[in-house]
Each structure stands twice: as C-alpha cells, then as structure tokens.
Amino acid sequence: MAADVPGSPLAKNATTEEALAWYKSQYEELEQELKEFQQSSKELEAELEKDLDAADKRERALQQKAEGLSYEVEEWKRKYKESKSEANAAQSALEKEITALRETNRTLQLKLRDIEVANDDFERQARNTSSSLEDLESKYNVAIERAVMMEEEIKIGEQERERLRVEAQRLREELSDLKIEAEILQSKLRKHQARGHLTQITTTIAPAPASPLSTASSPLVSTPPDTKSLSTIDTLSEVQDPPSPPMSDASLGKGLRASRSTPVKQTASRPGGCRTPKTSISKSAAAKSSAQATHKANQSFSENNITPKPKPLSSSTSSQSNRPSNGRFNTNSYPMVRTPSSRPSGARAAERPRAPVHRIPPSNSLTHIRTLTAQMQKLEARVHSARSKLPATAQTPPKQSPRFSGGIGGLAATVAMRGKKQRGVGASTSSLNLLDDDNASDISGTHSNPDFRSSTLNLSKHIPRLSTSGVSRIAFGPLPIRHPASAAASTTSTSTATATNVDSEVSRPSSRASSSGYGRPISRADSHSTAASGYMPSSSSRPISRTSLPGHGTRTPVGSWPRSSGNLSAYGHGPAHSQASISYSTAEEDELTDDGQRELRSKTTPARRRTGTLSARDAPDHHHTGIPIPGSGGNRRQSGSSSASRSSVTGSLSLRRQSNAAALGHGHGHNAGYGHGHGTVPGGTTVRKVVDLGETY
C-alpha cells in the first residue's frame, strides 16, 4: 500500500491542495480496502464456523467411536484374559494327563516285557512237555510191544509146558507098564534059575579095598557085585545092595534098553542083588537066555533103525573095572566129572581081583551091549567136543549157598556120621502115599532087586499133583547150586537143558527138595544128601539161554529158570553111602527123548550103590532140572552124559529134547530116588520098604 500511494505530499514542491487532494485520495482507498477486508473477514468467519461445526461434529463422532472402541478393547481384554486362563488351565491339565499317560505307558511296557518273558518260559515248558510226552509215548509203545511179546512168550511157554506135562504123563504110564513087564520077566528068570542052573556057587572072595578113583560103574553094563555070604548081605545090605545103573543110561533109545534087558534079569535074579561068582552053567540054559535077550535086542533095534557095530570087548572090560570091588565109594575123592578122560585105564582094571575062574558062556546080547558101550563112549566124546562150541550166556553164575561150609569132596562140618546099619528114609518130594510094611513086603516078595522093587512101588503109587494156587510161581534168577559133583560135565552135557525147561518153569510150583531159590529153605532130604556126600555149592557154571539153541530166536525172560519135579535126595549112611530118593510130578516132569527111554529106566541093571545122589539142580549147570546127576567120587566113568549121543543113536531128536534127556541121564541109578526101609523076603534077600515123606507147597 505504501507503493500505491503517490509520493508523499510533503514533498517540497507539493501545494496544500495537492497535499489535501492526496490525503483524500488515500483515505478513500483505505476505506475501500477496509470494506473489502471486512467482507472477506465475514465470509472467512462463516466458513470457519462451518468448518468448526463440522470439526465439532467430527470430534463428537470420533469421540463416540473412540469410546466404543475402548469398550470393545476392554471387552477383548477381558475375553483375552479369560481365554488365556482357560488355556493355561487346559494346558496344565493336558500336561498332567501327559505325565500320567507317560507313567502308564512305562508301566505297560514293563508289564509287556514281563509277559513276554513269561510267555517264553511257557513256550519252553510246552516244548519240554511235548518232547517228554513224545518220549513217554514212545516208551509206552515199547512197553506195550514188550508186554505183548512177553504174553506171547508166556503163552508159548504154557503150551510147551502143557505139552511136556502130557508127554511126561504118557511116558510115566509107559514106564509103569514096562516096569510091570520087567517084573514078570524077572520072576520068570528067577523061576528058571531056581531049577538048578545057578547051584554051583563057589566060595566067596573077599572084596578088594576101594580105589579112590574108581567110583562109578559102566554107563551101559553094570557088573555084578562082589560075592559075599548071605549073612554078610543081611548085616551090610547098605554096602552090598546095588542100586540101578545111572539114570544117564535112560538117554538111549528103545534098542539100547531092550538089548540091556538080559543083564538086568540076570543080575536081578541073584539073591539080594549081591554079586556072585561067575559059575559054569549048562550051555543049553545059557543059549536059551541069550537067545531070548538077542531076540528082544534085535526087535528093538529094528524098531529104532539102529545097526549095532561089533566092537572089541575091551571097552566093556575097562568100563567094568571102574566099579570098586567092595561096593563102596570114596566121598573124599574128587567130585565125579562125567568126561571121557575120567575113565580109568584098562591096566588099572586088570590089577583088580577078579571073580573065580568059573564063568558063564558069553551071549550075543552081552556082545551087543558091550558094542553099544564102545559106541556110547565115542558118541560122548563127539558130543563134548560139539557142546564146547555152543555159545554161552551172559548170565552171571549163581552165588554159592551159605548153607554148606565143607570143602569139595568132604562132609559138612555140622553133619554127624551115621553107623553103617542106620537106615535113613529117602525123602520123596512127590505127593505119594505112604506104603505100610505089609504092602511093601507083599510087592517086594516078587523081586530080588530091592532098588528095582522100590522104584516100581513108588511109581505105581504115584499120584499126579498140579499146582492149585492158580498163580504161577516165578523164579527170579538161577538157582544156587548145592553140589559141584558134575561141574566139569554139566557145562557141556546139560547146558541145552536149561533153555528147554525155561518155558515150563514160569507156572511150575517148586518142590521142597529142590528149593534153592529165594525165600525157600532147603529140604531135609537135600541137606542130608549134601552132608552125606560132602558136596558144596559151586558158582562156576552158567546156564545157557534159549537164544543159543537152534530154532529159538526169542529170548526167555531172565530169572525164569525152571524148577523140576524129579529130585534126588539122600541120607548119609556111613562114610560114603546114601540111599537115593526120587519123585516125579505130573506137572513138573521134564521131557524124555522118546517113548522108549522109560523102558531103560524101568529095566534097571543092579549095580553097586552109588553115593551122594543129587538133585539135578544141585549140579553146577542143572539149576533147571530135577533129574539126578552123578554123586561124589573121583574120576568116575562116563554114563551117557551127553544128550547129543542119544540124538546120534535115535537119529532124529532135537537139541531141546536131548537136553531134557541129558538131565535125566545124569543120575546114579534108574530107581535111585525112592525111599527105602528094611525088610526081608524068603531067600535072605534084603528088602527096602518104600516110605514117603510127602510134599507140601
């Protein structure tokens, strides 16, 4: 504005009018500017008011909005706090739950581990149980099979036992018939000789002293006893009365028995069975008796298809020399061993005192007998060599019985010797009836051989007896051996008999005389026999098993060794004499080789009494049989100790049957085994009365 204003009027050449006029013009301009300024100020004020109102409105709205937002903020804060607290609570709860779950998981893991361990144990136990069950099942099956096999074997044994019993009964009946026939023949021979053929009896010769090595007679030919007066016979009948030949003679066939019938009748016809000097008789009588014997021998040989081969007579001479001249036996000598080497030589026999020069003319039957004697010697040697090759069993030998303390061949220390005239009663183990004196005298009156007569009585009065208990009595091992008499021969001659009788033993009752098993006392008869004979148990033998026999593949159960019924027992009579007793039971009879073997046992040849009669089970290898075997005495002659020799003679016998016959063939005499008493018949003959002690199971 200062620029628009004209120069100041106060300029030196400006007049008052100009100055006025300038002032006036300035004023008007200023006023105009004021009005415009006022107007513009009003407009601006109005606009500012409007703006202020609008700002107020906006402020109020914003304030309301801020208040609402603050409220919302508060709400959200509250909600946030609530949700946060809830989240914290949930988090803490979840954390606690997680902790519990972790603990639970750990516990479950431990339990699972224990369960797995237990499961492993259970699985192991299950495997063990299954394997044990399989083993048990296999063992059970094996046991069942074994039981079935044993039942079959027992059935077979029962059948064999029944067959043997029937066979033994049949053989016993035939033996009784043959004894009756022999009795008739002997009576006829005595009547024939009583007519004057034996009237030239010369003076007797004193018997020579007994030899310690010659204690057995010939197995087939028993020489007559030495001659003594009838008074001496009556007083010393136990010395002079000869028993029958050893039962091993029964191992021959019918032909051998028939051929021996003549010596039986000749010797039995002499008074008292005593040896008489050989006298000269008429040739016609000798021819007649020899013709009868030859006819019977030839007939028997034709039945058995046996052709006798003539041999020199030296064999019978040497065999006869084995008999002691005085009829006694030395019990202190070596126990008799039935081996061919035990026979005395012929030179020793030649040194013996002989009978008077008067002799009976030789007969064909005697020649046959001597020939058969030589054949038997050869067969015995062959059988011994054959049996030595048989396999032996693995069975331990039986233990020695503590009942006897005496040495071999000597008497027991606790046994008192009896006098020569004391006559013991042979204890028969079978259930026979006692025979009174009248019956014994009546029956024995028809016999001059008391041994033969007593055997006939005892067998004729035999009553078969079976076990009524209904339960089989089984032996649990080999029976102890009472006598060592046949220790050397029994291992070869009777080893096969063991296997044969095994089947029959399972259900066989034991007898008192053969009781040497467990829990059974020894019988009185066997104790006396052992004491009198001086035997002692032996444990040097082994029984043979059935597997070693041909045709028998099955093995017999261990411990079932049979006890047989035929048992020998004896009482002591003097230093070396005993009387034998034998019994037979139907259910316990061992099998003979054939039908004719009992004929040989029935037709006994009188010979000297042999000492120490044994039960067959008393021998080392005879646990299984009751057939008698040789007694004491050293180097006694063999008497058919091999069962194979009978097989060679008869031709078709099996080894099993031979073993039973071998057991039968080891006795002292055929009729050794019957109780004897005293008695006399007309003619001064000493008669033994049969007495039986009976048997109790």
From Swiss-Prot:
Keywords for this protein: Coiled coil, Cytoplasm, Cytoskeleton, Microtubule, Transport
Subcellular location: Cytoplasm, Cytoskeleton
Broad class of where this protein is predominantly found: cytoplasm
Coiled-coil regions, chain positions: 11-195
SUPFAM superfamilies from the UniProt entry: Tropomyosin (SSF57997)
GO cellular component: cytoplasm; kinesin complex; kinetochore; microtubule
Xref: Pfam families: NUDE_C (PF04880)
GO molecular function: microtubule binding
Highest taxon, organism lineage: Eukaryota
Positions with biased composition (Gly residues): 670-682
Polar residues composition-biased segments: 226-238, 259-269, 327-344
Subunit structure: Self-associates. Interacts with nudF (nmp-1 or nmp-2).
Protein's recorded name: Nuclear distribution protein nudE homolog 1
